[in-house]
C-alpha cells in the first residue's frame, strides 16, 4: 500500500531545476521536477551510492548524478549504461496548489 505525502507547493517546483524536498517520516528527500511538461517525483538519492541527486544536474530529461556522472532518464527511471540501476518514479497528484506523492 502506498503512503501519500504532501511534498511541496506547485509554485516551489521550478522548470529546469532539481530541488529536493524533505518528507516527514522518510529518511530521504523527494525530488520534484518537470520532465518535458510532466511533473515527476523521484527519490532524492542515487541508487548507486546514496549520493544526493539534487547536487547533480538536470540535463535533457535526465538527472546526472554529481558523484559518478550516472544519467537517469526521468521518463523511464533507467540509468544509461547501467541497466541494473533503476530510479523509482513516484505517482504525483496535484491537490489545489499542493504536490502530493505516493511513496511505494
Which role fits each region the language model picked out?
Residues 1-60, 89-104:
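N-terminal pre-ligand scaffold of iron-sulfur
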Residues 46, 65-68:
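Short cysteine clusters
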Residues 52-58, 71-81:
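Iron-sulfur (Fe-S) cluster-binding segments and ferredoxin-like electron-carrier domains
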Residues 60-66, 80-88:
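Short cysteine/histidine-rich metal-coordination sites, predominantly Zn2+-binding motifs
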Residues 67-69, 79-81, 100-103:
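Low-complexity, flexible helical/coil segments
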Amino acid at each position: 500500500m502506498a503512503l501519500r505525502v504532501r511534498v511541496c507547493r506547485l509554485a516551489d517546483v521550478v522548470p529546469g531545476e532539481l530541488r529536493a524536498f524533505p518528507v516527514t517520516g522518510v529518511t530521504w528527500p523527494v525530488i520534484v521536477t518537470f520532465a518535458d511538461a510532466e511533473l515527476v517525483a523521484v527519490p532524492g538519492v542515487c541508487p548507486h551510492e546514496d549520493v544526493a541527486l539534487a547536487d547533480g544536474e538536470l540535463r535533457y530529461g535526465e538527472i546526472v548524478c554529481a558523484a559518478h556522472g550516472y544519467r537517469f532518464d526521468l521518463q523511464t527511471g533507467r540509468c544509461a549504461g547501467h541497466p541494473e540501476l533503476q530510479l523509482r518514479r513516484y505517482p504525483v497528484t496535484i491537490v489545489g496548489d499542493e504536490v502530493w506523492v505516493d511513496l511505494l
